């Protein structure tokens, strides 16, 4: 362990238990990876049906691949680490988002939109919801407003991801 960095706030990033334990004490060069507090990781990491995570071609690919591997976001059902159920949680969130989008199409009123946002706040998986609702500008705005800490400077006026100022993507 690097004693100098161990208690530095600049070396502190909140992450889920699985991401932290998968990374463990791996010694890394932070500039070889993308970080959600410095980069627009939503621009470089793709979330897809089935809970799958991949790199967006042409956007800091090497750095995105390295962070995905470091924290194990690429683990899938066929990976031996059965205790890591993040892929399953992402798949369930994806399916929930699809159902919510279908219901919104049948009942497109503010109350339904507000209910969906309440569900997102309670369940998480913001990136999945942003992906599923990518063609609904109102929902994208609501999603960005709903979760404190979302960097609105990472998106253009149509809510498409753009490079984060000072970041790698």
Residue ranges of predicted features:
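Cys/His-coordinated zinc-binding microdomains
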Residues: 17-20
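Cys/His-rich microdomains that often coordinate metals
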Residues: 23
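Helix-loop elements that line ligand-binding/catalytic pockets
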Residues: 31-106
């Amino acid at each position: 362990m690097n004693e100098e960095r161990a208690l530095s706030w600049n070396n502190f990033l909140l992450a889920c238990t699985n991401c932290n334990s998968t990374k463990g004490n791996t010694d890394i060069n932070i500039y070889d990876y993308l970080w959600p507090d410095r980069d627009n990781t939503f621009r470089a990491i793709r979330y897809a049906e089935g809970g799958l995570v991949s790199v967006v071609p042409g956007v800091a690919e090497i750095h995105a691949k390295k962070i995905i591997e470091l924290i194990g976001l690429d683990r899938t059902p066929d990976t031996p680490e059965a205790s890591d159920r993040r892929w399953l949680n992402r798949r369930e969130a994806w399916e929930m988002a699809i159902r919510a989008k279908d219901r919104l199409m049948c009942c497109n009123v503010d109350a339904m939109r507000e209910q969906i946002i309440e569900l997102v706040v309670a369940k998480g998986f913001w990136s999945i919801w942003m992906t599923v609702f990518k063609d609904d500008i109102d929902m994208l705005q609501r999603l960005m407003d709903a979760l404190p800490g979302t960097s609105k400077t990472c998106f253009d006026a149509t809510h498409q991801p753009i490079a984060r100022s000072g970041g790698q993507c």
